[in-house]
């Protein structure tokens, strides 16, 4: 080593002024013993699980002085019968509509199931345990009434709360107080995917939410409870297709999130396909294309008779070129018997309105289709398919293709294909497509009272939210708190009601979509989620007070 470097260290005489970075003085912690606690709850006696069901769990133990890391286990029954069936990914979180922790009828903390799910997107273990597996999410088929479509299993839902942030520091101190955790469940229709053949009514009649609640309880000797702060999410839904929404009673808010949800109406949410466990954009498109190909190209001795009268099928000529208006499609199927012909469906799914002369035709989105016909199975094995089908095409519900706005008979598939359509009622879908790929917001403006708090014409708040949360959740978020937890009170924007600063108003400009595309006509709903700041004290039981002004 260079002598100059050595002398600069040895000869330095200000050691007393410096802090040791090679060791620390170890502190003796408070004496405590953690343990796992499991509780059976009381479930409301509702004979029909297609309505909201409520389970309550009471926690009171003279030896447990603090708790954290709440876990809800949900038993999913064995599923038997005829038809196609699967559970939505992360089914445990989708089971939950609302959860609250209360003491003597005062709510300490509450959250929706969707907010719980969003908070755990960076926790792969929590997501997997909540019901993300091939066994649960793959669409399985039963052929006879005694066929087992799904085995019974249990999913474990981590209910992430502010009391888990810093383990013992942030744990909920009970102070010899009874705690009640209440879980409201979603209808069964929100957690399953099925076709029209599956006996949904019988399944709902027999379905019962069987649950247990677990948590980590701490036995603490001489606990010294200190005041603390927690953030509680609060959400507001805007009016359908309106570009503005307002959150009132804003006093101390640590963040604001904005996103769009699709609204399909009261009609059955039927879609043409669903990939099941694998959820990439490619998986969605591949499954959709496979469904269409069964009707798009057929081999028959005469023109197929199993399509509706409005279906237009043409015989593929020897050249293999099928022309639909200004589009040429190349179709070649090998090994076709001499007494049979290849037919192409030229209007499998079409959409048009009186205001627009352009017809949206999915048959025109295919450019090349090649394959080999198997006479023994009467099926075509496709070897190459070139197309421009995208995720928005996949995300169009059947009801839009068949709606009154469409001047055409939009759905010209065979009855066999229509019977394979799936009912999907996922309440956690964001954006207007299944993967939230289409950024439906082109401009965002947030006002605090009458003053513009933030404005953007590019999705900077969305990019930063993905970066800071380490996951993609499709939300634009303004964070007002970057303060380290436990030792510091979270920073917030503070209300000033005398100047009208007690509400957050959000206005968005929706991205321009092609009015010829059916996705244009899906209703949109603006959703705002803010996190209000509360102070937790233990003067006489557990008290949670909303922060009204700067303290």
Swiss-Prot record:
Q: Does the keyword Hydrolase apply?
A: no
Q: Which domain of life is it from?
A: Viruses
Q: Name one GO cellular component term.
A: membrane
Alphabetical UniProt keywords: Membrane
How the protein sits in the membrane? Answer: Peripheral membrane protein
An example of a Pfam family matching this protein is Pox_Rif
**GO biological-process terms attached to the record:** response to antibiotic
The record's listing under InterPro entries reads: Poxvirus_Rif-R
Locations listed in the record: Membrane
Q: What is its main location?
A: membrane
* Family membership: Belongs to the poxviridae protein D13 family.
Q: How does it assemble?
A: Homotrimer. Self-assembles to form a layer. Interacts with A17 (via N-terminus); this interaction is necessary for D13 association with membranes.
What is the stated purpose of this protein? Scaffold protein which forms a transitory spherical honeycomb lattice providing curvature and rigidity to the convex membrane of crescent and immature virions (IV). This association occurs concomitantly with viral membrane formation. Targeted by the drug rifampicin, which prevents the formation of this lattice, and hence virus morphogenesis. In the presence of rifampicin, irregularly shaped membranes that lack the honeycomb layer accumulate around areas of electron-dense viroplasm.
UniProt miscellaneous comment: Displays structure similarities to capsid proteins.
Q: What name does the UniProt record give this protein?
A: Scaffold protein D13 ortholog
Q: Which organism is it from?
A: Swinepox virus (strain Kasza) (SWPV)
